[in-house]
């Protein structure tokens, strides 16, 4: 049996078709890829966005047929917080590392202007972590945990009147960062007629506001028909339940009410089966691929442009990564040299200013010293004059005292002679 191989030469426009004379064995590549993938396991990260009490945790338990044992969240949180939990699941011989990220407190605040920012920051942070791992010299993309969000389930409150402003703003901010599938939560609370009108209203508002939600791919012939049909059912009206009831000989998930029972996996009751089929069984790999090839690549492109990297130069000619790096390095060194020269000039200028300031201070101190010397000399002169005057007064006093003593003695002698 001959095998035809299409060979593409980049320098040629036409394809060359070669024939082999025998079996080589590269037709086993798909099997090798499957075995390698099964050995490494798979990663799938889901983000659930919606107001508190819409059944996000219950739906996750129902989708993956397990109990993630999440704790209820209060309605009184002052801000939105994101909590991510990672679980190891295994079905047959396929291992899945599942991360569920919940938006705790979303939509519970009076001022909801900043509710979406925490979500956007979290998604960007996961992209940044992956980018930093890619940029390492010694990187380990296979072993590092990929925390990029592959799908965002946006839970819509079943009001029946349309989307809230917060819903539109948040989905508009996220549609270029993550695959979004809107779902109508607790769909058993509104009638089927209202539900169809509600779905149409939601799609009309999304289109009017330019919100791009995830569309199931139709380029694969094996699933094109199914995906085309399922695209028309978005947003899915879902019901989740952790309770089981017995129908015949089977236990099925359901919600029981006084007026009847809603079977979760009954497609006439809700769209849960459609969501599970599209999300897990048919398009999970497409969501993972689109996250990497579209959303992450867009983030990576913007970040590299912010760093100064580009595929073309100023003349719109192709430029390699190394050339860009060398140009950035040269610019950085020139800028560094310029900064060093600027700092040196600033230092010299400050030294000169300080020297001038010190000289001026020295001059002032010298002037003060001279003044103090003059003042001191003047005080000394005055004191000397005072001392001399005092000495003269003292001598004059002594002379007068002597004169008085002599006069007194003479007077005493005169009186003695008369007697």
UniProtKB/Swiss-Prot annotation:
Highest taxon, organism lineage: Eukaryota
One Pfam family recorded for the sequence: Septin
One GO biological process term: protein localization
Keyword GTP-binding: yes
Cell division found in the keyword field: yes
Positions of region (Important for dimerization): 259-269
Keywords assigned by UniProt, alphabetized: Cell cycle, Cell division, Cytoplasm, Cytoskeleton, GTP-binding, Mitosis, Nucleotide-binding
Chain positions recorded as GTP binding sites: 50-57, 79, 105, 186-194, 240, 255
A GO term, aspect molecular function: protein homodimerization activity
InterPro entries: G_SEPTIN_dom, P-loop_NTPase, Septin
GO cellular component terms, semicolon-separated: cell division site; microtubule cytoskeleton; septin complex; septin ring; spindle
Stored CDD domains: CDC_Septin (cd01850)
Gene3D superfamilies documented for this protein: P-loop containing nucleotide triphosphate hydrolases
Subunit structure: May assemble into a multicomponent structure.
Function of the molecule: Involved in cytokinesis.
Family that this chain belongs to: Belongs to the TRAFAC class TrmE-Era-EngA-EngB-Septin-like GTPase superfamily. Septin GTPase family.
Protein name: Septin-2
The species this protein was found in: Drosophila melanogaster
Taxonomic lineage of the native organism: Eukaryota, Metazoa, Ecdysozoa, Arthropoda, Hexapoda
GN (gene name): Septin2
